[in-house]
Amino acid sequence: MRPGLALALVSASVVCVLGAAPRAEQPLPARLADTGGGTQLIVARAPRTESTSGTVSWWDLRDGRWVRAGSAPARFGANGLVEGTSRKQGTNTTPTGLYDIPFGFGIEAPPSGTTVEYRPVLESSWWCEDTASRAYNRWVDPLPADCRGAESEHLVSYRPQYSYGLVIGFNYERPVRGRGAGIFLHVNGRGATAGCVSVPSDDMRRILRWAEPSRSPHIVIGTADGVTAVTRY
């Protein structure tokens, strides 16, 4: 056999064995069933439903492709994650699903460059979690007569957690009483959360500066796989 022919056959066999170079995996948001229709997305992902830690990443849609703008270690509910449509209030679980972001808030002044609506937390600021109140799952300032303080969050009392935050639109537009209230993306406390998603303070400030209301940012919360996988939402 001619040397040149032998080399060609060997080369061809290598190509057949190895195959073509694998295509790069699509960015995570591109693998989601829905991203909310905007061009900014926050992805909060835990390994499993029983996990209390994971990652948060935030993404921009640029020229038809999702590009990661940042990422941070994240914490979830002390009892893990649960499908948002079946969650029950007071269970210390983080609701999975795709949600809008109604507004930002904080005990501290907004980071320079913040463009989302940002409500300052005052001594009179509360989040009503009383299922009997007309203000259920709403920011109230001051606390209305029909909302019991013992069933609600006095926002200024939660430092450093509420130094900076974004409201997650879970159970927000048409609240189902008893499903849950006051689910936020906020600054880390000492450990796992009561159902919110938390990140380090510097990263929370970065997210606030990054989010642009004109680009309709959303947040998706879920697991790496299974029935609560972020790619299902």
Residue map of PLM features:
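Conserved "landmark" site that anchors the functional core of diverse proteins
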Residues: 200
